Amino acid sequence: MTNVSTAFLVFSVLLIGGEMGNSVVAIGLTGGIAAGKSTVSKIFQEAGVIIVDADVIARKVVDPGKPAYRRIISAFGEDILIERDKTIDRAKLGALIFNDIKKRKTLNACTHKYIIYEMFKRLVLLKLIYRHQMVIFDAPLLFETHFMELFCYPIIVVSCPKAIAIDRMKKRNQLGEHQAEQRICAQMSLELKKQKAHFVIENSGSIDELTEQVNHIVSALRKIP
């Protein structure tokens, strides 16, 4: 990714805002770990909102041969590769960086600019070519990636009580309570995310209650000129 291509992309995103007045450039969707963001994202999709998923893009930018892949191998060595196909073993890499802030920052430095570039490239296509009014950036690290936050309005945060999040992680990830607690503590405070949000979705009830909250937000977003 060259500086020229990055500059062109930023110019295109700014052009979107100029062409469409005060309309939304990208709606931000983030939340706490195990808060149910993926479920909320699916409900938004069912309501006709286009989703650009950072996790999906993050997996693609580290395919063998890609620049981010080469940078990760250079930083962490070939021990993190799956022998069969030379793809990155996400579980092994995750375990390596989990309790090491310096290594997490190193990984982010290897991947974030490629993820952001691909997300904004899709935004330009969806807004300028296909003329979609509402496009959501579904990004777990939206606030931590400050550049992305600048181009998101409004921002939606999915929240749930800590006890529910821990229970979900124990079932979904086969983690012990202490491990689940560690993963929560390793992330930005959910309370801080909620303070920075324009909408908060509380995911502690039924799927019907969750859907009702999403539909209410979709109705509000459609009223934005």
Which residues make up each language-model segment?
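ATP-dependent small-molecule kinase phosphotransfer cores
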Residues: 56-133
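Extreme N-terminal, non-catalytic leader segments
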Residues: 5-24
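Walker A (P-loop) phosphate-binding motif
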Residues: 18-47, 54-56
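Well-ordered beta-strand positions
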Residues: 50, 56, 154, 198-199
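Small-molecule kinase domains that catalyze NTP-dependent phosphoryl transfer to phosphate-bearing small molecules
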Residues: 148-149, 171-220
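N-terminal polybasic phosphate/anion-binding patch
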Residues: 40-41, 52-63, 78, 171, ...
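An amphipathic alpha-helix signature
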Residues: 47, 69-73, 162-170, 177, ...
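ATP-dependent NMP and nucleoside kinases share a basic, alpha-helical "lid"
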Residues: 120-129, 137-168
